Amino acid sequence: MADLKAFAEQLVNLTVKEVNELATILKEEYGIEPAAAAVAVAAGPAAGAAAAEEKTSFDVVLKSAGAAKLQVVKAVKEACGLGLKEAKDMVDGAPSTVKEGLAKDEAESLKKTLEEAGAEVELK
């Protein structure tokens, strides 16, 4: 019984790489197809932590205006409802936060708009 508990402890503490190696050995040497659920259970704690850390609020950060600065200024002006001077100051002050606390789809949309205008953009 103690041997089984020790084996179970070793099995639970395997890394993802080690689980993949074990699956390969079981398949090639013993003809056993490991169930996908067993691999998911082994990776469960790490996967659960990643899901818990998934962000729901994003900041759109303008890293640089690129070559088409005028187009980027126009895009920032329209996206943020700023005046021309404020938009230009934001673009000139890059890196700067264009908008904060956006949902993922809104942030992705704004990022795409700014990138199409020629800007280098990052989501944080």
From Swiss-Prot:
Keywords: Ribonucleoprotein, Ribosomal protein
One cellular component (GO) term of this entry: cytosolic large ribosomal subunit
SUPFAM superfamilies xrefs: ClpS-like, Ribosomal protein L7/12, oligomerisation (N-terminal) domain
Segments passing through the bilayer: none
InterPro entries: Ribosomal_bL12 (IPR000206), Ribosomal_bL12_C (IPR013823), Ribosomal_bL12_C/ClpS-like (IPR014719), Ribosomal_bL12_oligo (IPR008932), Ribosomal_bL12_oligo_N_sf (IPR036235)
Molecular function terms, GO-annotated: mRNA binding; structural constituent of ribosome
Glycoprotein is among the record's keywords: no
Residues forming coiled coils: none
GO biological process, alphabetically ordered: translation
Domain of life, source organism: Bacteria
UniProt record similarity statement: Belongs to the bacterial ribosomal protein bL12 family.
The protein's assembly and partners: Homodimer. Part of the ribosomal stalk of the 50S ribosomal subunit. Forms a multimeric L10(L12)X complex, where L10 forms an elongated spine to which 2 to 4 L12 dimers bind in a sequential fashion. Binds GTP-bound translation factors.
Function (record text): Forms part of the ribosomal stalk which helps the ribosome interact with GTP-bound translation factors. Is thus essential for accurate translation.
Name under which the protein is recorded: Large ribosomal subunit protein bL12
Organism: Phocaeicola vulgatus (strain ATCC 8482 / DSM 1447 / JCM 5826 / CCUG 4940 / NBRC 14291 / NCTC 11154) (Bacteroides vulgatus)
Lineage, opening ranks: Bacteria, Pseudomonadati, Bacteroidota, Bacteroidia, Bacteroidales
